[in-house]
């Protein structure tokens, strides 16, 4: 054994230059969610501007404004992060993940704010707290407690972090990335449908 020691073979699926890059997917997702939360605290989502306006006009106006803010926030954040030195392996995937998760956060929080007013915003804040621990952004889920492991698959931020990681460093299977996109799209469409249902109540 000592005369001919075993040689290990190492294979790298991705490369992360430092701890900041490793934590970036978590911080990017957190910033987009908080941005949507702040917007829905400041924007009068329940206010009707025109008494003679239709429910459809109200819905489209709220969705359009929220969508524009979400899009602008995502593009600005992604651009500034790259401009300040964040190394991105797949720029298209990076922007797409930022935009999609920004829409998901915006419309989910918008629905909660519209449906329940301030209690709904509080629920959105609780959702943020749960995602901080349960999305797997700081520590591997294998060393996280059972509660967070149980809710992990149901949190939108789980999938944005996963796709951001692949955009930054690669190494994640395409099928897993596609699943992340499908889940975020499902959250976005579901939130819009729930928001649309409110105008008929």
Located regions from the model:
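Membrane-spanning alpha-helical segments of multipass transporters and channels
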Residues: 1-199
